[in-house]
Every structure is written in C-alpha cells, then in structure tokens.
C-alpha cells in the first residue's frame, strides 16, 4: 500500500512541499545563530556527499559535455539558496515562501527572452496580477528594512526561474542526479567567499544537528520532487506544490507566532491564483 501511495505524483509533490517546509523551519531556527551563507554551505556540502553516493549506487557518471550549462544551473541554484535562506532569516516564513513561489512568472519571461518562446496575449494580464501581488507583499511605498529583505526573497524567485530554464535545457541529456550534483557542488563553492568574513564555528551539538538535518531533509525533499515529476505531469506537480505556502505559514505561526497581515494574504492569493493559471496556460 505504501509503495502504491509513493507512485502517486500528487502525493509525492505534497510530501516534497512538506519536507521542504520542514527544511525552511530548520533554516530559520539555525539562522538565529548562524549566517545564511554558512547554512547554504553546510546544506550544499552535505547534499553533495549524499547525492554523490546515490550516483555511485545508480552507476551515474559525470558527463564531459554540457558542463557550461550545468555550471550555469549550479550558479543560479546557489544564488537562489543564498537569497531564499537570507529572506527566511529576516522575514516571516509565509512571506518568503510566497515570494519564492513567484518563479513561474520569471520562467515565462526568461523563456521568452532566452528561448524565443511566444507569450500568449492572455498571459500578459496574469503577469500583471503577479506583479500586483508582489507589490502588496514587498510594500515598496512604505519603505522599511522589511522591504529590502522582501526584495531579496523576490530575487530568490528570479534565480530559481533561471535554474528551471537551465534544467529544461539539461534534462534531455543529463541524469537528474548529475544535475543535482552540479547544483549542490557549485552552491558549496559559491557559499565559501560569501560566508568567509562572517563565518561562525558551530559551537553546540544543537547547531551541528540543525545543519545535518537541513542537508538530509533537503535531499529527501529533492528525491520526493524528482519522483513526483516522473509519475505526474509537470503542471499538476507545480500547482500542487503551492500547498507548501500553507505548511510554511503553519510553522511560522506555531514556532515564531508569525501572522501574515491583510496585504500579504491578499498579495499571496493573487500570486498563487495567477501562477496556477500561468502553469495551466503554459501547458495549453
């Protein structure tokens, strides 16, 4: 019965979203004493080791072709992690999650700019709705430090979209494990100079435990997500993943008493509805 359930793409997408929300909560807790770039380093280094072991077990070798695009995907993914973890450390989990889930908006823009894909006229209105929702969350007209952190969260969606476009170019020729390996290995290297001046030696078993848990849980989420895409259409998986916003909001309320304000809730609804519509439009 369990094996049958794990063949459900929708259930796997929900499990992936839940697992990543747990990772986000662990990141927020760790960020109380450790810099975001350092958390990215340990998350990526642990993940690199684990995915390498999976590659060995599956007999997946590193390619000699397509390396530049693999590196581009790695850099985009690394910058996504840095921005996302930084946002998680400074703004409510729900807010950071909503902003990161704007990546379909940027995927469409990048696909038009770099892949020459045509944007249907109806999509322009949906893009405007996404922008309006983002403005309601970032609140640029009531400038504060929150707005700066929210912009960083928005950048995480930009870099996630860049990584997604690169994956579309890579997935036909490269094994998923290899793509993930390059992502994590490059993220490890990118994090080193970013954390160099602010590095804090983890001083307690609790801090080491959090870092280890982040690395393991994040890779588990990646496995669930990869399997979800193999059992269900990309559109359905992408739409299902928006439940992650609910999970993140739940952790934020439960552990940090975070309650989104009315503008954030309204903006989040606009973004989710518009991005789901964008996903369905793109499929058609």
From Swiss-Prot:
Family classification: Belongs to the EamA transporter family.
Induction per the UniProt record: Is part of the operon cntOLMI that is negatively regulated by zinc level through the Zur repressor, which leads to transcriptional activation of this operon under zinc depletion.
Q: Which UniProt keywords apply?
A: Cell inner membrane, Cell membrane, Membrane, Repeat, Transmembrane, Transmembrane helix, Transport
**Which GO CC terms are listed, alphabetically?**
plasma membrane
Name this protein carries in UniProt: Pseudopaline exporter CntI
Cell membrane among the record's keywords? yes
Which InterPro entries is this protein grouped with?
EamA_dom (IPR000620)
Residue stretches making up the EamA domain: 8-138, 151-279
The record describes the protein's role as:
Transports the metallophore pseudopaline, which is involved in the acquisition of nickel and zinc, and thus enables bacterial growth inside the host, where metal access is limited. Is probably involved in the export of pseudopaline.
| Membrane topology recorded in Swiss-Prot or TrEMBL | Multi-pass membrane protein
Pfam short name (any one): EamA
Answer yes or no on keyword Repeat.
yes
> What is the native source organism of this protein?
Pseudomonas aeruginosa (strain UCBPP-PA14)
The record's statement on gene disruption is:
Mutant shows a large decrease in the extracellular pseudopaline level, with a concomitant increase in the intracellular space. Mutant is unable to grow in airway mucus secretions (AMS) and is impaired in iron accumulation in this media supplemented with iron.
Q: What is its main location?
A: membrane
Its subcellular locations are: Cell inner membrane
Q: TM segments? A: 2-22, 34-54, 74-94, 96-116, 122-142, 147-167, 179-199, 209-229, 236-256, 259-279
